[in-house]
């Protein structure tokens, strides 16, 4: 597929970045993330309206993640020869359809169908996001373009829940999803206007997705991705009980800590391109090492509110390097099969998020308050060591 990519990255694409297309992709990603997490702040009215429990309504988030994991694995096999411009438009249509189905849902089954449509769009879009980016900008600009996309993710993660809750009180949960559908329509038009034709992979160049794992350093990279994201979710999923019981934060104080984390994450994402230009491997090894030290500091001295707040800020700044860094690794080291590598990466991250949260919860309930921190720190340290020893990196 290397010849395919080279042939289809025209002279303009190589020398001049298409920022309008990059920002349209970033906006689409932000909309997907916002819609993914809208139910978190709307569970109570959704459950009451549909006559189900909040726990059952919460499965609308679970089904999205579950479908996204499988969609990410198989989407590139399905769309091999299709122009990626039409594929992205299809994902934006699925986003819009999902919002409308949820808005008009009169049963739990229809709600799940709507959320499954979102999962298809979410998993598919993430699977091809890295390869899309590398076909829209010159190679040296890829980290900057990825930082724009992940910056949009950071903003979406910060505003999704509070925005959904605020608007839900004003206009009702169904109209919140109607408004999200309007964002989906805007995505469709922006993509049609800005995204150029991006031919798919010719049939004679098809390759089994999982054969990529046989390449030197790729399996190590995917294991490192798994451990870093599992470590993140082992800690961050339980930041509320840890910070409220260990450091003594109240609800208002915790809100400020989470806001500080979100702002730091956005800043870290914005600065990531400058760091990754110097050394991707150093960033991918250094970031989890700093996080391992942060987990140790919080375990030992987390009862001090200043220390705990500082760790949250450092964590947000540092972890922001990891998703951008691994996407950059794919665009450089697996450029000839970036879509398939992206598919595996998304599935690994979804699995890691689930496992990290589950094991962290078990540790919290059965070992002690700081056990999620120790688990997270151990996984981050192992990630740093694995990246240093085994992960291969090609220069841009």
UniProtKB/Swiss-Prot annotation:
Keyword NAD assigned: no
Signal peptide: none
Localization: Cell inner membrane
Presence of the UniProt keyword Transmembrane in the record: yes
Topological type in the membrane: Multi-pass membrane protein
Catalytic reactions of this protein: inosine(in) + H(+)(out) = inosine(out) + H(+)(in); guanosine(in) + H(+)(out) = guanosine(out) + H(+)(in)
Keywords: Antiport, Cell inner membrane, Cell membrane, Membrane, Transmembrane, Transmembrane helix, Transport
Residue ranges of the TM segments: 22-42, 55-75, 86-106, 108-128, 148-168, 176-196, 216-236, 256-276, 282-302, 306-326, 344-364, 367-387
Classification via CDD domains: MFS_NepI_like (cd17324)
Ranges in the topological domain labelled Cytoplasmic: 1-21, 76-85, 129-147, 197-215, 277-281, 327-343, 388-396
Role according to the record: Involved in the efflux of purine ribonucleosides, such as inosine and guanosine.
Family: Belongs to the major facilitator superfamily. DHA1 family. NepI (TC 2.A.1.2.26) subfamily.
Name under which the protein is recorded: Purine ribonucleoside efflux pump NepI
The species this protein was found in: Escherichia coli O127:H6 (strain E2348/69 / EPEC)
């Amino acid at each position: 597929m290397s010849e395919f990519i080279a042939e289809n990255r025209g002279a303009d694409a190589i020398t001049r970045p298409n920022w309008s297309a990059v920002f349209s992709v970033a906006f689409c990603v932000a909309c997907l993330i916002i819609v993914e997490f809208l139910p978190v702040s709307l569970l109570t009215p959704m459950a009451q309206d549909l006559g189900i429990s909040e726990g059952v309504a919460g499965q609308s988030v679970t089904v999205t993640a579950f479908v996204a994991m499988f969609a990410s694995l198989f989407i590139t096999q399905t769309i091999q020869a299709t122009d990626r411009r039409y594929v992205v438009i299809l994902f934006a249509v699925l986003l819009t359809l999902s919002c409308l189905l949820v808005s008009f849902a009169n049963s739990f089954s229809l709600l799940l169908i709507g959320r499954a449509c979102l999962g298809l769009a979410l998993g598919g879009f993430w699977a091809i996001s890295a390869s899309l980016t590398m076909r829209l900008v010159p190679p040296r600009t890829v980290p900057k373009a990825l930082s724009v996309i992940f910056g949009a993710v950071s903003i979406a993660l910060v505003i999704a829940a509070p925005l959904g809750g605020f608007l839900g009180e004003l206009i009702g949960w169904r109209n919140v999803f109607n408004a999200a559908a309007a964002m989906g329509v805007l995505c469709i038009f922006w993509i049609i206007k800005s995204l150029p034709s991006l031919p798919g992979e010719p049939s004679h160049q098809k390759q089994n997705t999982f054969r990529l794992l046989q390449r030197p350093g790729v399996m190590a990279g995917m294991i490192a991705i798994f451990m870093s994201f599992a470590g993140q979710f082992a800690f961050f999923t339980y930041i509320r009980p840890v910070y409220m019981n260990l450091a003594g934060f109240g609800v208002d104080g915790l809100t400020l800590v989470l806001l500080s984390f979100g702002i730091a994450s956005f800043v870290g994402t914005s600065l990531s391109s400058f760091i990754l230009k110097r050394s991707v491997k150093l960033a991918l090894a250094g970031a989890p090492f700093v996080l391992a030290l942060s987990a140790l500091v919080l375990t030992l001295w987390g009862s001090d509110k200043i220390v705990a707040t500082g760790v949250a800020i450092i964590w947000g700044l540092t972890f922001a390097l990891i998703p951008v860094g691994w996407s950059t690794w794919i665009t450089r080291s697996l450029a000839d099969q970036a879509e398939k590598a992206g598919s595996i990466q998304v599935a690994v991250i979804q699995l890691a998020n689930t496992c990290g949260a589950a094991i962290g919860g078990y540790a919290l309930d059965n070992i002690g308050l700081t056990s999620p921190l120790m688990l997270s720190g151990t996984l981050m340290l192992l990630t740093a060591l694995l990246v240093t020893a085994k992960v291969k990196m090609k220069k841009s």
